[in-house]
């Protein structure tokens, strides 16, 4: 019985997916401990909330634990995993622990290759504005709240559903969003795209008969699976056939303005405090959910207009000085797949028309670089200046002709932009300072250690 579990230990507690669950469990009154290879702002926050944090992994770290939570990034050879098995302590996958939390609430789960974090944040923000006090677990820090997780007293738990390891199939939400489906994390699915699409069908089919699948029909792969889903469906998009759709969409002062048409309801004029057509789609998904659960139109409009974004999702670091006496704009973004990168580049062009766009990119995983190589070359060639660094391996072994140098050579051969290759991420900030010009927009992108570059530039260049 659940009351027998009092102490829960997280291996890799500093990761964004693990830390959010740990914070909610702390707020539920559980004793929480965790280990990670290095301290960061996340582990420091959890320690202040009462978690016992260990630096490094050791068998002694799990002393007293009633359950041990792991992610797919944690190897079976991890000494804490080995010790837990020896002591017969239950080892719980991260997604299964999230599923247990979801059983305590009505779950709203957001799935899709791109846009999960922003969409989850938008849903949580609207429900919060509507007075529904949701619990949420997000894959990025909600800027307005200063955290990626919160225990609310309301009926709903809003969370990302991770398809990368197929663990979203543990979840049993009452509302499921699918933003899009692209070929990513294909190792999980035996490099079979049909298996990946079937997993999304299975995810939606886990809904109860009274649930709702909220699907973006602008995405061709989502449209393809739609006939296979037998649960109630609400569609959204720019497509005229969408039940929740955006019309009269325009870019104004770094924001998106549009009108939302909903079947049987009054039109809704919306200002979204984020740039990009992809973010309009994210907002439509959130509006569809909010409408379904009874949030007022006033709450929807206010939350979207005041939405301050999510950490590392088109996160603006303001203006910074250049060597020629001018200033450049600095933006940081988590995007690391060619499709989401193209959407973010388009958003940057829309937000800063006429400016030179400098992209600083660290590829994430050799397998993704290999599988999407030509698409990467195409999207990287759409910038005005390009700084490339070596692939962040995320535990993978190098793959021949799928490293940063190979990508730089291919972009150079394409002939549209001359890449600057920087081997070490620690040297990227200095390279950017040397090449940046007045009025440039510098967009730092990637899911690995590149995340340290924008803060380093922002801190160094601060007045």
Swiss-Prot record:
Gene: murC
Lineage: superkingdom: Bacteria
Residues that, per the record, bind ATP: 112-118
Alphabetic keyword roster: ATP-binding, Cell cycle, Cell division, Cell shape, Cell wall biogenesis/degradation, Cytoplasm, Ligase, Nucleotide-binding, Peptidoglycan synthesis
Transport as UniProt keyword: no
SUPFAM superfamilies named among the record's database cross-references: MurCD N-terminal domain (SSF51984), MurD-like peptide ligases, catalytic domain (SSF53623), MurD-like peptide ligases, peptide-binding domain (SSF53244)
GO cellular component, one term: cytoplasm
Organism phylogeny: Bacteria, Pseudomonadati, Pseudomonadota, Betaproteobacteria, Nitrosomonadales
InterPro entries with a match to the protein in the record: Mur-like_cat_sf (IPR036565), Mur_ligase_C (IPR004101), Mur_ligase_C_dom_sf (IPR036615), Mur_ligase_cen (IPR013221), Mur_ligase_N (IPR000713), MurCDEF_pg_biosynth (IPR050061), UDP-N-AcMur_Ala_ligase_MurC (IPR005758)
Keyword Translocase recorded: no
Protein name, UniProt field: UDP-N-acetylmuramate--L-alanine ligase
Pfam families in the record: Mur_ligase (PF01225), Mur_ligase_C (PF02875), Mur_ligase_M (PF08245)
A GO MF term: UDP-N-acetylmuramate-L-alanine ligase activity
Reaction equation(s) it catalyzes: UDP-N-acetyl-alpha-D-muramate + L-alanine + ATP = UDP-N-acetyl-alpha-D-muramoyl-L-alanine + ADP + phosphate + H(+)
GO biological process, alphabetically ordered: cell division; cell wall organization; peptidoglycan biosynthetic process; regulation of cell shape
Family statement: Belongs to the MurCDEF family.
EC number(s) recorded for this UniProt protein: 6.3.2.8
Biological role: Cell wall formation.
Pathway(s) the chain acts in: Cell wall biogenesis; peptidoglycan biosynthesis
Compartments it resides in: Cytoplasm
